[in-house]
Amino acid sequence: MKFIVKLFPEIMMKSKPVRMRFTKMLETNIRNVLKKVDESAKVQRQWDKIMVMVPDDRPDLIEAFGERLACIPGIAHVLQVNVSTFESVDDIYQQTLAVYKDQLAGKTFCVRVKRAGKHDFNSIEVERYVGGGLNQFTEAAGVRLKNPDMTVNLEIDNEQLYLVDKRIQGLGGFPMATQEDVLSLISGGFDSGVSSYQFIKRGSRTHYCFFNLGGDQHEIGVKQVAYHLWQKYGESHKVKFISVPFDPVVQEILERVDNGQMGVVLKRMMMRAAARVADKMGIQALVTGEAMGQVSSQTLTNLNVIDRCTEQLILRPLIAMDKQDIINISREIGTEDFAKSIPEYCGVISQKPTVKAVLSKVEAEEAKFSDDLIDRVIQDAVIIDIKEIATQMDTKITEAETVAAISADEVIIDVRAPEEEEKDPLEIEGIETKTIPFYKLATQFADLDKDKTYLLYCDRGVMSKLQALYLQEQGYSNVKVYRP
């Protein structure tokens, strides 16, 4: 049994030197991936295809090899074939009949032949001869050249006959590492997972930069998304996962920045930090999952203001995509379930975000920050080889307990920002309520009565859940989320 790996058409269109370089890289990538399945994998490069040989005594490898080949960038499709030699056109027919006789019963069919080498016949003659024989000596429902129930695919390569047993759709794109590296800003949601996948598929080693706003549980979830993408689509090359503790930045934004500017300022601070990380790694481009108009910070005006904070190239592969299309891709690539369980925190810090930020106003707000703020969070960043995440894959993302009813001995903590709380104060008769903004809760919770149970409240339930998880990570078990 062999697999014939067909190159993505854009590779075939390259100049001879570039095509050879891409093909060599694809051969290496295939070998690197399949060797992890079994050391017996043999890969052989030819001018227009790559052959993968499966040992005759290891039929158990066929399915595993096929699944891996389907996810390697640079492959148009893969043919799973039985290999033999032939002496004549009739011999080709006899071998085809032996394989397809039972499969054709009651079905319309056509025969398609691809041929390479010198022969005293052409492809059309083989199609007619084999098709006529199969039509006459099987119980097929007849020949149908357009939209048949079954297509009998044959490939003739000099003296070898390839009877195609299965056609596997490839990923397309370019072989990994034929394009330059990128740094993807990943949050674990639908958008950042799909945008990362798009650049893996296009041939870039995609490293991951995560801005941690939600404690260990949030980080574990995002790491699982990144590891899944790497293991399934980019395993042929090493990449890095960088975690940047960004809660000090968020706290300064909430305490010092005008509410309407918070979203744009946060994104600019993230871009600055990511650009610093990219510079250290020798990477020239950042990748984000932003789509035009999807949220307030992603208007063209705001994206323009965000881009002004760095000289790094910022790539947005999803910029004109609809949300449902993004979700559909996430389902296809296996990140949908991860994304459903990971909340997006960036959108909860501003209640009246501007959709037309003015650069001078944003820069004036940013002047309120500590000069060394970005330097400090970058210094505390943790960089790991993505393979190390495998040791954390069994860690489950825990959920903070959520309640709708309150007992008299429980205390509600309103964690909303002061202006939100003042606009719509939470008052429940007979229940003690405290007001502690979420960005101060971590430092003030230790001063509270440890014998009481505290229910955290915010309008959307996102920030309250985030803070409950963080407090639980610090060892506090007397905290829940209140969702009336």
UniProtKB/Swiss-Prot annotation:
Query: Which CDD domains does its entry note?
Result: PPase_ThiI, RHOD, THUMP_ThiI
Q: Which InterPro entries match?
A: Rhodanese-like_dom, Rhodanese-like_dom_sf, Rossmann-like_a/b/a_fold, ThiI_AANH, ThiI_fer, ThiI_N, THII_Thiazole_biosynth_dom, THUMP_dom
Q: Which UniProt keywords apply?
A: ATP-binding, Cytoplasm, Disulfide bond, Nucleotide-binding, Redox-active center, RNA-binding, Thiamine biosynthesis, Transferase, tRNA-binding
Q: Which residues form the active site?
A: C458
Under which EC number(s) is this enzyme classified?
A: 2.8.1.4
> What Gene Ontology cellular component terms go with this record?
cytosol
Q: Please list the reactions this protein catalyses.
A: [ThiI sulfur-carrier protein]-S-sulfanyl-L-cysteine + a uridine in tRNA + 2 reduced [2Fe-2S]-[ferredoxin] + ATP + H(+) = [ThiI sulfur-carrier protein]-L-cysteine + a 4-thiouridine in tRNA + 2 oxidized [2Fe-2S]-[ferredoxin] + AMP + diphosphate; [ThiS sulfur-carrier protein]-C-terminal Gly-Gly-AMP + S-sulfanyl-L-cysteinyl-[cysteine desulfurase] + AH2 = [ThiS sulfur-carrier protein]-C-terminal-Gly-aminoethanethioate + L-cysteinyl-[cysteine desulfurase] + A + AMP + 2 H(+)
Pathway the protein contributes to: Cofactor biosynthesis; thiamine diphosphate biosynthesis
Pfam families recorded: Rhodanese (PF00581), ThiI (PF02568), ThiI_fer (PF22025), THUMP (PF02926)
Primary site of residence:
cytoplasm
Question: SMART domains, per this entry?
Answer: THUMP
**THUMP domain mapped to chain residues:** 63-167
GO-annotated biological processes: thiamine biosynthetic process; thiamine diphosphate biosynthetic process; thiazole biosynthetic process; tRNA 4-thiouridine biosynthesis
Q: Which GO terms describe its molecular function?
A: ATP binding; CCA tRNA nucleotidyltransferase activity; tRNA binding; tRNA-uracil-4 sulfurtransferase activity
- Detail the disulphide connectivity of this chain as listed in its UniProt entry: C346-C458
- Any idea where the Rhodanese domain is? 406-484
Q: Which compartments is it annotated to reside in?
A: Cytoplasm
Tell me the residue numbers annotated for binding ATP.
Answer: L185, I186, K267, G289, Q298
The organism sits in which domain of life? Bacteria
Q: What does this protein do?
A: Catalyzes the ATP-dependent transfer of a sulfur to tRNA to produce 4-thiouridine in position 8 of tRNAs, which functions as a near-UV photosensor. Also catalyzes the transfer of sulfur to the sulfur carrier protein ThiS, forming ThiS-thiocarboxylate. This is a step in the synthesis of thiazole, in the thiamine biosynthesis pathway. The sulfur is donated as persulfide by IscS.
User: Which family is it part of?
Assistant: Belongs to the ThiI family.
Q: Which NCBIfam families match?
A: ThiI_C_thiazole, tRNA uracil 4-sulfurtransferase ThiI
Q: What name is this protein filed under?
A: tRNA sulfurtransferase
